[in-house]
Amino acid sequence: MKYLDKIKSPADVKNLNEDDLPLLAQEIREVLVDTVSQNGGHLASNLGVVELTIALHRVFDSPKDKIIWDVGHQAYTHKLLTGRYPEFETIRREGGLSGFTNPSESEHDIFYSGHSSTSISEALGVATANGLNNDKHTAIAVIGDGALTGGLAYEALNNAGRSKQRLIVILNDNEMSISKNVGSVARYLAVLRSKPGYFRLKARTEKIINRIPLIGKKISEQLFKSKTRLKNLIYKSTFFEDLGFRYMGPIDGHNITQLCEALEGAKMVNAPVLLHINTVKGKGYDFAEKSPSEFHGISKFNINTGEPVYSGTNFSAEFGDFLCDIASKDKRICAITAAMSLGTGLEKFRKQFPDRFYDVGIAEEHAVTFSSGLARGGMVPVFAVYSTFLQRCYDQLVHDGAMQHLHMIIAVDRAGFVGEDGISHQGILDAAFLNGIPGITVYSPSTYTELKHAFIRAIYHSNGVVAIRYPRGTEKPVPESNDLSFEPFAVYGRDDSDTFIVTYGRLYSYACSAADELISRGYNVSVLKLNRIKPISEDAVKRVLSCKKVFFFEEGIKAGGIGSVFSEMMSEKGFKGNFNLTAVDNEFVKHAAVSALLSEYSLDENGMIKTILEYDDGGKKDEA
């Protein structure tokens, strides 16, 4: 690469000739498409901010000026321009670059990221600290129009506008226009008001007028009011200015010259600025431009066709299909998503039942409380949400769901390890935090068939809030003798075994394989699978009380998790044997393939066998 090979830091971006910048953008897009096609990741959003990222690093001095990317999934170009091009081919691979911003990876990454609508709050905090430290550097938040549907973003805008801090919020508008403007005059003024010369002239004029004895201040105030009235004739909305921001734009987000001029102008304003830019999501790759949602987060794909390498079914798709089947017979079923209809498998439901489908935007808290209203009205709401995003609505689950004794279903997708999306997306906390909420029932099916049984039980044989958690990806093979009744628990193997493996969810497949291998070596081992992990069946606990050893394996956080509760219940009932819990300790889990993470935490077949064999031949059959 002629230009990327030379860029070791943002300083090298500043040294390029202006005519070279479009060629740099072209190289970056080639690298983005090629790398994501091999590693998977977020493509459309990154293709849309190439020119913006170049302009940011050309105008500002990162990391002294702090660029904060909302969600962080669109920071690939940022990584390329901050010295990480040589390692970029490792992105989302174990031991390689993160798919999101990561401060441990680079000083140019200000925060760990992955969740939406946080950037303005973070940038306001940085800007406030700058003010307290008399630091003249700038805090910049880059947020998309999608993330602006999150309530946290509006809380931050409300506070930032009143703060008077030196803060720049860049609104990357690639789907909708926040404020519809009128005609060519508006477009001309948008460009004019973004030029540095405009702000220099404005500042000098205000300074001269304010020096006029007696009447200077009044003249300045009247001119400001007149300018505002004229602007309001041209612009329909002054929402951001009403909040206290200086509004600039909209600007062509793919014109580097205009972007640089606008950013230079924004730097000169000693007040919060909102720079509104228009971009094309997926720009430069036809398949992504035509179907940006499908290329938002994508697995490995064929560059020439745009088709994913793997296109089979998965838990999300099976959930979506089955929910459509139920909804066709039961008019009470409603589906709710927080801007994740594709990811959660609800796209088919959206098309078939548009009157009972609700995309609330990035507003998980609202989704739960909205569901409570639907439930109060006699409907059966099913809110599909990734485990990691369920964290955002804990209070609503408590106050507006469980406390109200309302019947609603939470479809907890991506439960457990999610792999390459990494530290901010691992679904390792939900079982533990749901475990502490009174009145909630939690199921954890291990196969597609069990998933369907779980939803039937949740919808027609349960009360209150019911959560059904299932992993990312495909089901794992289970023994043919697997009990399909989906009672609160099931046993694989002999009831009189000296050693029991206890687990739930997808780990059941690994547990059965481990048990079979240990039995072939002469060990007396069975598996107890918890289908309902909250409340745990007392009969399930009684089933293992006479064992010598119980090994609990859990794909989640150890503290407060299901294994801890199971251990406590056994102790209360007088268990005299040895208990071992293998789970995730008090730590966040890095990005790597799911198989690698299961191996690292001793949660796959080999890990289970090794853990059990570390105990001196306990559970081995007596030899004749």
Annotate each language-model stretch with its function:
Residues 359, 515-516, 521-544:
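Generic long, charged, amphipathic alpha-helical segments
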Residues 301, 306-312, 419-421, 440-441, ...:
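Peripheral docking tails and interdomain loops at the edges
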Residues 66, 271, 279-390, 396-406, ...:
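Non-catalytic terminal/interface segments that mediate subunit docking, oligomerization
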Residues 42-163, 332-333, 337-338, 346-347:
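Cofactor-binding active-site loop characterized by glycine-rich and histidine/acidic residues
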Residues 219-287, 407-412, 431-481, 549, ...:
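Structural signature of the thiamine diphosphate
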Residues 1-81, 241, 245-247, 252-256, ...:
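N-terminal amphipathic, basic-rich helices that act as targeting or association modules
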Residues 261-264, 296-297, 314-329, 345-351, ...:
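Glycine-/acidic-rich phosphate or pyrophosphate-binding loops and their flanking alpha/beta elements
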Residues 4, 175-319:
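Long, well-ordered, tryptophan-enriched scaffold segments
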